[in-house]
């Protein structure tokens, strides 16, 4: 069996419990086709770089999968049909990462954004304050 990293984006207007239900549905599909689901990272609700089907935010979920190609094809087929899934991508990898993904490591334990993003937001606020202080 091959190793895959699979990420999907779910609509912003569904409940977090529905995201977990989608995840368990796709896990059962993978296991029914003889595959195994490894690490699962739920990155939560995050902003999108651009609007996708009128959504500005989405729930991001990353899954490590050890499964045959038929299982991946079936999961992708079902995601294509499901209206709650905005985008998905599957990448074949040589080995799964042991530590957290780069995106997940930027989140702290409470689910807050990382320091780099916080710094950029504070500098943006300072620039906006300076602009507002200028009289025309």
Curated annotation (Swiss-Prot):
Organism (species): Bartonella quintana (strain Toulouse) (Rochalimaea quintana)
Region (Disordered): 117-136
One GO term (biological process): translation
Role: Binds together with bS18 to 16S ribosomal RNA.
InterPro entries with a match to the protein in the record: Ribosomal_bS6, Ribosomal_bS6_sf, Ribosomal_S6_plastid/chlpt, Transl_elong_EF1B/ribsomal_bS6
Example of a GO MF term: small ribosomal subunit rRNA binding
rRNA-binding listed as a keyword: yes
Keywords of this entry: Ribonucleoprotein, Ribosomal protein, RNA-binding, rRNA-binding
Entry similarity comment: Belongs to the bacterial ribosomal protein bS6 family.
Top-level taxon in the UniProt lineage: Bacteria
Name the UniProt record assigns to this protein: Small ribosomal subunit protein bS6
Gene3D superfamilies xrefs: 3.30.70.60
Pfam families membership: Ribosomal_S6
Entry's Gene Ontology cellular component terms: cytosolic small ribosomal subunit
CDD domains associated with the record: bS6
UniProt biased composition (Basic and acidic residues): 117-130
Keyword set includes Ribonucleoprotein: yes
């Amino acid at each position: 069996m091959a190793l895959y990293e699979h990420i999907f984006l779910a609509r912003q207007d569904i409940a977090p419990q529905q995201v977990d239900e989608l995840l368990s549905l796709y896990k059962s599909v993978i296991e029914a086709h003889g595959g195994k689901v490894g690490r699962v990272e739920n990155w939560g609700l995050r902003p999108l770089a651009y609007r996708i089907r009128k959504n500005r935010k989405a729930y991001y979920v990353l899954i490590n999968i050890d499964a045959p190609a038929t299982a991946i094809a079936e999961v992708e087929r079902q995601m294509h049909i499901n209206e709650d899934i905005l985008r998905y991508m599957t990448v074949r990898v040589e080995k799964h990462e042991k530590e957290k993904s780069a995106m997940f490591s930027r989140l702290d334990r409470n689910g807050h954004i990382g320091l780099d993003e916080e710094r950029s937001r504070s500098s943006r606020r300072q620039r906006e304050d300076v602009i507002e202080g200028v009289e025309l």
